[in-house]
Amino acid sequence: MFASRILRNSAQTLKTELPHKETIKMAYDLHKPRSTAIRHLNENPEEPILFLHGIFGSKKSYATDSKLIASSTHTPVYTMDLRNHGETGHAQPFNYETLAQDVKEFCDEHKLDKVKLIGYSLGAKVSMLTALQFPNLVKSAVIIDNAPIPQPQIQLFMKQYIKSMLHVLNESKIRADDKDWKNKASAAMKRFLPNGVIRKNLLVNLVNKPPKDFESPVIDFEDGYIHFLNPIEQMEEMAVKDVTDWPVETTKDLKFEGPVKFIKGLQSPFITDEGMKAIQTHFPNNDFTDVNSNHDILDQRPSEYVKIITDFFNKQRYQSAPDDTILGNKTPTPKQTEVSA
């Protein structure tokens, strides 16, 4: 067990355990396609896209990319905050079974069916488990740089992320009314995380005031200091243990037969030989595209990964839809373009 730290002092910060909730309502943004220049090209609302972020990300992390994907595929894209992220409530547990169930409940609540999933890192594992456990809900998926196996080798990364964020909360004492609060927080994290892209992504959830009507059972947003929207103290062990884990026993006999595109960073440690074997076992209808990147594919290769996704989803749509539902006349099926940087 990790030692519990008290944020600043007990009078300033609430100190309780996270409440236990089997499911939780997820905050979301809906990105609709821009009107197309092709007058008769229909949107595809029956097969919406759900974009699930990585650890300590949010629905706002790749909003611009989601808008591009929505317009390029003529399909609405939902970006959601997973529990303990962004504007979604704080609760335990934080294991993959619970996160996948949250996605299922979101789809039920919004009457979504035959969804197409995009998952990055943490969101990739959530997407894979959602497809395996609820195959009738999911039509296809794009999995960005992760595999359905336990990954103890990445625990060190998680510990560094947590250490840097706790340093901002416990040691830096940055006031919420400081005009330079975000830059000061980034500078404080630099000693633990020299990579500016990683710091930028972690700072997405750092605020000097909470979103409207947002409340947390464990964070006192009125104490005059900046805060992460993540309950960092309570997530310390969960982020290291649960995020790097995978429910091996409950998924050992599960397969998802739908098409799945895997995007792999050539310099990333996340998809090992063991991970490749697990992918072949659980997702037999898989297709891989390698990109010249480490795990930070979405930041290092933004145009490439967006094109891979849109080509993949558009190929499925044109192959499965009758010609007269696409353009009102016969339209040749476009060739898929693989992008590898």
UniProtKB/Swiss-Prot annotation:
It is found in: Mitochondrion. It comes from the Eukaryota. One of its GO terms (molecular function) is carboxylic ester hydrolase activity. Residues 1-40 form a transit peptide. InterPro entries: AB_hydrolase_1 (IPR000073), AB_hydrolase_fold (IPR029058). The active site is at 121 (charge relay system), 145 (charge relay system), 295 (charge relay system). Probable alcohol acetyltransferase that uses acetyl-CoA to synthesize acetate esters from various alcohols. Not involved in the synthesis of ethyl acetate. Its EC number is 2.3.1.-. GO terms for cellular component: mitochondrion. Residues 48-301 form the AB hydrolase-1 domain. PANTHER family: PROTEIN ABHD11 (PTHR46118:SF4). This is Probable alcohol acetyltransferase. Belongs to the AB hydrolase superfamily. Pfam families: Abhydrolase_1. The keyword ATP-binding does not apply. Keywords: Hydrolase, Mitochondrion, Transferase, Transit peptide.
